[in-house]
């Protein structure tokens, strides 16, 4: 994949611990560094990310990815909800993974969980397949396709404990992508920037149709750039009707 630039990520051990109640082990830090280097190389051919400066990459791709699963990393994480019930997670899917975020950092952090990286762009999936192989990540797999099609596929529908959606579409569209893929009791995590009560109210009718409820909304500030972020935790409490997800393109064109 070409020569790798030798830019080093910051260690940030104290910030990991203070904000997530967790910090990576030495091998995980090495994997994060290797991931960063391979993403920089891949960026020469593919538009994977505009975030390439080491501290910004650490915050917006590594820390942000893992902030969403903070309850899985530590039951005593600062700022996470005691009400959020997260049993053992064996299968997760990252919908619209792009350059592999949040899926790959989560696979590195949760070695017991198999993470499927879903994207419709074949070139990005081909890159991620090579990256996973080069990094020796055993608990990550790739899948090329649209969420609307994968959600109707018997091999994937109602098959995952955890669904991750970051920077893909409006919340109701993300919910329509994610909830059909979850087992009963499964959890969808929607990574958002700003979030308002009006958006919560607008999301509710879609969740009623999809068999989901809002279990928790976590607001937080990023540790370096001090930006406002939110994670929405949606619980699947009833089977998703067979009509969802609707055909390719329709969820975005006509949101629930």
Placement of each model-derived feature along the sequence:
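Conserved SAM-binding loop of SAM-dependent methyltransferases across substrates and taxa
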Residues: 99-112
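Class I SAM-dependent transferase core
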Residues: 2-89, 93, 123, 129-140, ...
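Compositionally biased, intrinsically disordered/low-complexity regions enriched for serine, proline
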Residues: 7, 21, 84, 99-102, ...
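S-adenosylmethionine
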Residues: 113-116, 120-256
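Conserved S-adenosyl-L-methionine
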Residues: 94-98
């Amino acid at each position: 994949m070409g020569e790798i630039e030798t830019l080093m990520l910051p260690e940030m051990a104290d910030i990991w611990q203070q904000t997530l109640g967790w910090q990576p082990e030495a091998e995980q830090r090495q994997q994060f560094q290797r991931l960063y280097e391979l993403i920089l190389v891949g960026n020469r051919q593919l538009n994977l990310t505009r975030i390439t400066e080491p501290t910004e990459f650490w915050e917006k791709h590594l820390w942000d990815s893992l902030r969403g699963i903070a309850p899985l990393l530590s039951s005593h994480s600062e700022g996470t909800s005691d009400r959020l019930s997260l049993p053992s997670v064996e299968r997760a899917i990252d919908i619209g993974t792009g350059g592999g975020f949040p899926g790959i950092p989560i696979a590195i952090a949760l070695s017991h969980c198999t993470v499927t990286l879903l994207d419709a762009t074949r070139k990005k999936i081909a890159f991620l397949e090579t990256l996973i192989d080069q990094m020796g990540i055993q608990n990550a797999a790739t899948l090329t396709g649209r969420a609307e099609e994968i959600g109707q596929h018997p091999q994937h529908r109602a098959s995952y404990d955890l669904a991750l959606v970051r920077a893909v579409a409006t919340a109701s569209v993300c919910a329509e992508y994610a909830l059909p893929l979850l087992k009963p009791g499964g959890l969808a995590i929607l990574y958002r920037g700003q979030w308002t009560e009006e958006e919560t109210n607008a999301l509710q009718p879609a969740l009623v149709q999809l068999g989901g409820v809002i279990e928790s909304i976590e607001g937080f500030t990023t540790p370096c750039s001090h930006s406002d972020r939110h994670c929405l935790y949606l619980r699947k409490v009833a089977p998703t009707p067979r009509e969802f997800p609707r055909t390719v393109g329709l969820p975005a064109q006509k949101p629930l």
